[in-house]
Amino acid sequence: SIDLFNSIPNITNLNNVLRYSKDDGNSWVNIELDTGSYELSAISNEIQRLMANNGDYDQNADNPYFITITANLSELKSIVHISNENYKIDFSVPNSIGSVLGFTNEIIGKGYNESPNIINIIQVNSILVNLDIISGSYVNGSASPTIYSFYPNVSPGYKIVERPSPSLVFYPVSRNEINSMRVWLTDQNNDSIDLRGEQITVRICIREVKNVKRDIVRAIKTLKQDEVL
């Protein structure tokens, strides 16, 4: 079993930049979201907060924010609505958040802007639990130390409580003696998962494989040594 909080970030310094212009592209401003686990609505809220910090909002309007991001749930795309005709967004900059929102190198302006691609807000599709004392496990046809895998099915910030279902799967132990073992988590690409300092609890079950023939031979040898036979 494994217990941990879903603190896996989908926004890092590799995809956290939003570049926008408030004067029809004559000058540009970059804002950066902090590393974290964001849902689409949280991305929109954080962008609006950062823009408001820059003074780029209309406090007298019913909706004071010039940029709002929502989802097209039927097509799994994002919608970026820009309400001010002088505002533009440039997704072509390095480390742009556009890669998360389904945009590539577009520059978009006022109105309804739907991403050409499906959003990529879930960076980790599968969590692999790896253990350095097993053998006989394979992932995508290659030998692997993976003892278990699962999908993080809770929202960011919530606790993941994962139990093997329907039953435990046992793998051969690759050592004769176990003095220590190493457990680590990777994603579907075998990249290490950043838990951002969160504690993780893993429970490993090890059982002895009975070998009746071997046990009988050992018993006979013991009895002979004790001169019972």
Model-derived features: positions:
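The ATP-binding site of the protein kinase catalytic domain
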Residues: 1-229
